[in-house]
């Protein structure tokens, strides 16, 4: 633990002590503009659809709070606080929103400066194509075929909001600003409760999106920080002491000699001491930790994560939130795809001169399919179908024009096909297409007060079919199944597009209203 404390001290060298004085400066909007924001561009407040604000309003509110009369009225009339008076929706919601947003902007400045200096020192090259979400799937296909086990980690754990404030003390040594942050966290009564799931945390973020997004990112940053520390400690590459390095070499030679004498036992225990090949991928509130080591090594890593996070985060980490599975016997839900690495048996016929024989070859394949149940549930929540997948009309859209209704349904269908184009099986997509097409027809029939059959005969199903199958031509990577005996080649083609920069709303159920 002393090594970790020394390792973490290096990361605290850029602590800032000027956040609170900077917050109450008159020209805070200038700092926000230099930070990369547009001071004149209004930012929409979630929960206040009719009100917008900019950093200039933040400056005016801070100047008004800095005046003596504002605080005198707050002291003389504590039950009628202009900022905390819930009876006045404008003061209780609008002022608290813009003040907390301004606080989040100022606190982000030292973190952005640190990231900027780090990127300038490392000179990290930027590739536009790697910004696509689909670019990670070819990486997983290339790496996961050689791995053996996988761990599913749920982030965040149940954590008190006070611990989130304590995380900022590593970077910001400013007591007034931390007290101001506690003021925002205590503004709503339910903010003092534990965060028990990613959904509840997202609901809190909807009240104050920028501030809680900053707190969540700081929490994940600290979590990945000690995870990186554990990974570096398990590797001999960063060792600088020659004596320790020689001891490691002698130990490896002894293990090699031991493996010659006891090959069976050595094969089971060697991966505990050797450096594993590990890959870490995080997606929203989940993380995937894949390794080439055995299941026993993954259990050791699980023990490290539980014990170390219990000491560092000062709370009990539930071991059941870290699931260990063999990669060939399990599947994982990642970014709207159900991915797995099954072992397929391929029968090959080999002929040499007059003799012919068959060879059975076992091969790993990275398979990605579209889960039907979550997507049908998302369509049901959006009122396109029932819970069992039966298409229904959408009465909310009956006031729109026919072209707007067709355009909305068609855009949803094209986005689904575009995002899930990497699926090796397209049957689920065709089922979703059928649900959306029939829901569109029933919506139009309800608008014109006719039956679906009459409306389809009058409009024609050919127009709807051409409308839904219209696809935009983009540069893509194609991975085509080269099997000569496939009668459904179009169902197995996998296409990864390089222009997808955001997750589909139906894939992420947290974004559905």
Curated annotation (Swiss-Prot):
This is Maturase K. Pfam families: Intron_maturas2, MatK_N. GO terms for biological process: mRNA processing; RNA splicing; tRNA processing. One of its GO terms (cellular component) is chloroplast. It is found in: Plastid, Chloroplast. It comes from the Eukaryota. InterPro entries: Domain_X, Maturase_MatK, Maturase_MatK_N. PANTHER family: MATURASE K. Keywords: Chloroplast, mRNA processing, Plastid, RNA-binding, tRNA processing. Usually encoded in the trnK tRNA gene intron. Probably assists in splicing its own and other chloroplast group II introns. Belongs to the intron maturase 2 family. MatK subfamily. Disulfide bonds: none annotated. GO terms for molecular function: RNA binding.
